[in-house]
């Protein structure tokens, strides 16, 4: 049976630097730099995939489980444990069949929300995400998914909250439940922190408290106060 080709375009600072697809015979991705990227002054991966070497005009991804068949510098944009839990729930809710090219679908879902500078197209978009975010509902659902994982059942009334949680949480790295949000200090309004924002909004990573007795969020708060990040 012939597999449908999936192509993901990879962008950096507005420039399409390469195209990524899946080789079902090699069971990994294949990536090719664009001529537009080769004209740029920078080299994003000079040690392993230097653009000056013709041999690396196209190359296969790393089959190691850590990289899921992607080139190492692209695999870094994949969701970690928490984001993967949300993504798996999203696949189930949308009746999407899992295939070996799933890493490409993950990158498309991440789109412009990766923690680094890379962006991926085509991108999944959802207008519902632009609405105000109810932090209490997010925290309750995040705790349910994190603690139940394989058995978490999403009710119809939670479906929109689930969509927002997947959107806000898949790109944030790490194993603990979290979301990237924006907070208006004047009105107290919460929104997605991964879209263009009006004035008076500041972006934060919100870490939700887990159901067990481990004070992980409190410990991280203490460390952040001891060693504040200076921007």
Annotated model-derived regions:
Residues 1-231:
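Phosphate/dinucleotide-binding and metal-coordinating scaffold of catalytic cores
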